[in-house]
Structures are given as C-alpha cells and as structure tokens.
Regions:
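Membrane-interface helix/loop boundary segments of multi-pass membrane proteins
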Residues: 133-159, 198-202
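Alpha-helical transmembrane segments in multi-pass membrane proteins
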Residues: 20-74, 121-122, 230-237
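Alpha-helical transmembrane segments
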Residues: 21-38, 93-105, 155-161, 238-239
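Juxtamembrane helix-loop-helix connectors linking adjacent transmembrane helices
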Residues: 43-59, 73-136, 143, 147-148, ...
C-alpha cells in the first residue's frame, strides 16, 4: 500500500454519505449494536435464564438493533442500494467467496459441535441477526460515512473500530492474551468484509459470511482447544491473504492517485 493510494478520495461522490459531523455519527452508530447486545445479555443474566433463554433474549435484542440500522439507512440521503443492499457484482474479483467458505469450514473442523440440539434454532436466529446487525452498522453506515476520507482509509478506520469494540468482551472471563487475539482477528474480519463491500458493492456477501462464521463458532461452544487455536491461526493467514487479494481488486479510481 503506497501513501498516495492510502490518501486518495473516491472518484464517485455517491460513495460517500455527506453528514455534518462524520466522526460523531460514526462513533454513535458504532455503539448501537454494542448497547443492544449488552442489554440483551444483561436482561438474560438478571432473569437467570439458561443458555436457550439467553440466546433467544439476545437474538431478540439484536434483531431490534438490526431494524434500527435498516431504518437509519432507509431514512438517510443515500438509497438502500447505495448502502449495499443490492445484488453483489464482480464475484470473480472476490474469488466467488471461496476463501470465506474455507474459513467457515476451518472453524467447524477445529471446534466441531458442542451444543445441545435444542439450542441450535436459537443460535441460528441469533447469528443471522448479528450478521445483519453488525454488517448494517459497521460496513453499511460507518463505512459509508468514512468513505468521505477515501475508500482505503474507510476500510482501515471501520476495521479498527470494529476490532476495538470487541474489547466489550473484557468482562467475559477470557485471558488477556485471548482477548487481544480476538480483537486482532475482529479487526481483520472487519477489514475483509469492508473490502467485500468496496469490491462487490453489496453487503450481502459479508452478511452471509458473518452469520455462517458465527453459527459454526457458537456450535463449537467457543472452544479454546489446541486444535481450535491452530485452526484460528490458519484462519488468520487465509483471511490475511484474501484481504491482500481484495485490496488489489479495489476499483482503480479509488486507490490510484
């Protein structure tokens, strides 16, 4: 990545969302999914719900959050199509999303299925809601606002925000090392999914990947076995390589001085 490429502004003004206070909108929008998700978990904890009740409660909260994101995009000046609610283009440039399917398969192979069958429908609802919610906000709203600074910077900024906000998991009992790894992986995840929006013009590939990834991760019971950690390392390499590939396929008008 050259400094000149990093600083380029998008050639198409339709790529941007002209808001008056971009960073205020960005930070405020970024916190909405966190607040709804945390609220869902808090309600479940206060009510002493079991795992099924917790999944259902959080899924309901996240679904409401996703609808809030959809409402914001619908009421904004750009159309829903401009935000990425459209059929993806340039599938070949994204390698037909094969690396994403490989990452999901690696998670499944590394963690297997460790949850009881009764909670699977609730997990599927939750992960689909999370995929819609986080892609609407971080790759839809936040990425659109940040594109005023150039597509390349928007990819980096939105990815960093997405990664840092995963520090919200600080109170879940994970070790500091595992938490740092999670933040780094989340930033890489956000980097690749933002690139997908820039290359394909659509949020749907990222939504599908996000939902599928979270589904197999939940089914594995958030395993931290040696096999799962090796799988995570391979995922990082694969996502990093895919991110490099997508970076080179960004529209030239957006990365060339």
């Amino acid at each position: 990545m050259s400094p000149g490429a990093f600083a380029v502004r998008p050639a198409d003004s339709a790529l941007k969302w002209p808001v008056r206070h971009p960073w205020l909108v960005t930070l405020g929008s970024s916190l909405v999914p966190v607040v709804f998700t945390a609220g869902g978990f808090a309600v479940a904890q206060v009510r002493g719900l079991d795992d099924l009740g917790t999944y259902l409660t959080v899924a309901a909260a996240v679904t409401v959050s996703a609808l809030v994101g959809l409402l914001i995009m619908w009421r904004a000046r750009p159309s829903l199509t401009d935000f990425g609610l459209r059929t993806p283009r340039n599938a070949a440039g994204a390698l037909w999303w094969a690396p994403l399917a490989a990452v999901v398969a690696l998670v499944l192979l590394g963690s297997g299925v460790a949850v009881r069958l009764a909670v699977v429908p609730a997990i599927v609802w939750l992960t689909l809601a999370v995929g819609l919610n986080e892609e609407f906000f971080y790759r839809g709203i936040v990425f659109k606002v940040m594109r005023r600074y150039g597509t390349c910077r928007a990819i980096v900024y939105s990815a960093l925000i997405f990664g840092v906000l995963h520090l919200a998991n600080l109170g879940n009992g994970s070790s500091a090392g595992y938490l740092i790894l999670q933040v780094v992986f989340s930033a890489l995840f956000g980097f690749v999914t933002a690139e997908l929006v820039a290359v394909t013009g659509s949020l749907w590939p990222g939504v599908a990947f996000h939902a599928a990834y979270d589904t197999v991760a939940y089914l594995g019971g958030d395993s931290s076995s040696s096999t799962a950690l090796v799988s995570l390392a391979v995922q990082v390499v694969l996502l990093g390589a895919y991110g490099w590939w997508l970076w080179r396929r960004l529209p030239r008008a957006e990365v060339s001085a």
